[in-house]
């Protein structure tokens, strides 16, 4: 096995050995951070392969980190980089609170994480020598630049196009028609938007060069997958990761779910109420401990906010069959993800109800012109300026959630009548197909 984690696919026996050593190293790393002072003193490092001993480690929630001011987060949770392993990047957390978290990533973190991103291409079926059109948003969230660099590292030609803000969508269609890439990678909603735009311009992508579409960063429903397959005339594969850990998994087209890189991450599925470890195949809360991308951010038993199943020994073809299969069910709390941004329902309500001009509202995640859209319907307080109120809602949602909503006004009383017809007011709803 290679000295660098993730460079090769290990055997099942090697993965077990990686877990034994990696869990000890992860706890030792965490104990260096002031945040964990006094939280891990009762842990017996010689018994971490015993699930009961490992379960004594307290679960880590994002709210614990969000509660810290920036200076405290970097001082108490993050570890100082070593002389030979300086900070290489900062990754923005996928969640939003008005004060997003920015995780430092060291050079060694990035080297290992790059293998996780590169595996997506190999697992999904991309081959060296092919060309990839990379259409993820470009910025401090890592997926766009990391998937592009991973394509290059995998022997694939890469076009870093972005998701419409850096390279206009119309130009991207021209480039796809002209350069004839084999693979498109991007968020599913943007891939559909490109397909619709191509159709409007008389370009038949279904009979074009792209034969593989790789998605990530937002939910991929069965209906959306089928529409992508039909419009692009391509196989569609999804992938799964999180900023706290890195790219963690991808579909191989055989198993029903993601092959998850269990040599880079130690995964648990627990009962979200009792915290008890669940048997394989049962739905529970995903808990992640990065084993090698923790040189500055020592995430330990991280509650990701996802409900999943995890099955081991799932038959498959090729080297990735050694990995367990993770199937994503839903978020454990009130979230939905739009264009890679997690919208927390409670935080959204707090924001809306702080605006004096707004009487009531409902928020819906919808699909419009193949793009995921945040539609916000508002009832405006009498005597308030409707145009100014709409502008305020747009501005505040953009400021806090970094997402531009589609705001519509309703006659006062409309929502009350809707809510009265339901036992539980459907104020925030995901209506995407």
Regions inferred by a protein language model and the residue ranges of each:
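Active-site phosphate/ATP/adenylate-binding loop shared across adenylate-forming ligases
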Residues: 4-6, 63-231, 237, 245, ...
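Helix N-cap/coil-helix junction residues
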Residues: 35, 45, 59, 126, ...
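Short, well-ordered beta-strand segments
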Residues: 133-135, 287, 377
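Generic structural signal for residues in well-ordered beta-strands
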Residues: 158, 236, 267, 361-363, ...
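AMP-binding/adenylate-forming catalytic core of the ANL superfamily
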Residues: 184, 292-403, 423
């Amino acid at each position: 096995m290679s000295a660098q984690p993730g460079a090769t696919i290990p055997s099942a026996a090697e993965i077990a050995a990686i877990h034994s050593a990696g869990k000890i190293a992860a706890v030792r790393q965490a104990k260096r951070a002031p945040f964990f002072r006094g939280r891990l003193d009762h842990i017996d490092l010689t018994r971490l392969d015993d699930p009961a001993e490992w379960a004594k480690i307290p679960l880590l929630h994002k709210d614990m980190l969000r509660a810290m001011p920036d200076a405290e987060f970097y001082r108490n949770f993050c570890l100082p980089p070593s002389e030979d392993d300086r900070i290489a990047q900062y990754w923005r957390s996928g969640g939003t609170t008005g004060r997003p978290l920015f995780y430092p990533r060291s050079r060694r973190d990035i080297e290992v994480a790059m293998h996780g991103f590169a595996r997506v291409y190999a697992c999904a079926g991309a081959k060296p020598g092919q060309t990839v059109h990379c259409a993820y948003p470009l910025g401090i969230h890592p997926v766009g630049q990391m998937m592009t660099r991973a394509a290059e590292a995998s022997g694939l030609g890469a076009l870093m196009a972005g998701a419409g803000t850096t390279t206009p969508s119309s130009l991207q269609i021209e480039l796809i028609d002209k350069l004839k890439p084999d693979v498109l990678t991007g968020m599913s909603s943007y891939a559909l938007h490109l397909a619709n735009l191509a159709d409007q311009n008389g370009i038949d992508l279904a009979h074009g060069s792209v034969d593989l579409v790789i998605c990530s960063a937002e939910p991929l429903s069965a209906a959306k997958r089928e529409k992508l397959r039909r419009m692009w005339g391509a196989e569609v594969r999804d992938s799964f990761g999180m900023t706290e850990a890195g790219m963690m998994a991808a579909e191989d087209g055989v198993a029903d779910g993601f092959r998850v890189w269990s040599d880079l991450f130690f995964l648990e599925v627990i009962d979200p109420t009792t915290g008890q470890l669940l048997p394989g195949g049962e739905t529970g809360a995903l808990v992640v401990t990065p084993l090698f991308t923790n040189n500055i951010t020592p995430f330990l038993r991280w509650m990701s906010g996802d409900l999943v199943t995890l099955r081991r020994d799932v038959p498959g073809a090729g080297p990735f069959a050694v990995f367990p299969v993770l199937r994503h069910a839903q978020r454990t709390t009130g979230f939905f993800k739009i264009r890679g941004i997690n919208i927390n329902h409670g935080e959204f309500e707090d924001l809306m109800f702080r605006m004096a001009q707004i009487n009531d509202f409902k928020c819906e995640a919808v699909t419009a012109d193949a793009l995921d859209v945040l539609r916000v319907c508002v009832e405006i307080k009498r005597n308030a300026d409707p145009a100014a109120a709409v502008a305020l809602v747009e501005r505040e949602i953009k400021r806090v959630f970094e997402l531009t909503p589609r705001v519509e006004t309703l006659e006062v009383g409309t929502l009350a009548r809707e809510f009265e017809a339901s036992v539980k007011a459907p104020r925030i709803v995901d209506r995407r197909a």
